[in-house]
Amino acid sequence: MTIGVIISTYNNPAWLEKTLWGYLCQDRMADEIIIADDGSGEETRMLIERYKKLLPIKHVWHEDDGFRKTVILNKAIVAATADYLVFTDQDCVPRHDFLAVHNLMAKKGFFLSGGYFKLPLSISKALQEEDVRD
C-alpha cells in the first residue's frame, strides 16, 4: 500500500519546516507528500523547493483569496496518487512511527483518526531539528 500525506499550509514556513523535519525521520517513509498551500508567499515556496530534494513533495498552490483551505485540500486530493491518504496541518510534527502505525492500522473501507499532543507555544517555538530527530 502506498501512503500519501497531505499537509495544509498558509504563510508559515517556520512551522511547515518543523513538520517536514518529522517526515524526514519516519520509520516508514511517505510515498508522496502533497503540500496543500492556501496562497502562501515566496518564502514558503522557496522552503518547499528546498525540501523537494529530500522528500517526494508535490506543491499544490492557489492564489490567496481569503481562507479557502477546503478548496486547496480538494485540489491536493485530486493530485494524489497514493492508495491511502493521511491529512495533517503545517504545525503538526509527527512522531517517528506515525506513518508506520497508519500502515499497520489501515483497513480498506475504514476511516482512521488519531489525536495529538499540544505543546506549549514556548516549547513549539524552541523546537529544533535535532529535537525532532532524537
What are these regions (language model features)?
Residues 112-130:
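Short beta-strand-to-loop element that shapes/binds the nucleotide-sugar donor at the catalytic cleft/hinge
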Residues 99-117:
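Conserved donor-nucleotide/metal-binding helix-loop-beta segment in metal-dependent transferases, i.e.
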Residues 30-39, 60-62:
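Short beta-strand/loop segment that forms part of the nucleotide-sugar
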Residues 85:
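Short aromatic/hydrophobic "clamp" motif used to bind/position activated sugar donors
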Residues 2-4, 32:
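Cell-envelope/extracellular polymer assembly enzymes that use nucleotide-activated donors
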Residues 63-80, 97:
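Glycine-rich, basic loop-to-helix element that forms the pyrophosphate-binding segment
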Residues 37-46, 92:
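A conserved acidic beta->alpha catalytic loop
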Residues 21-30:
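Short, acidic, metal-binding catalytic loop of nucleotide-sugar glycosyltransferases
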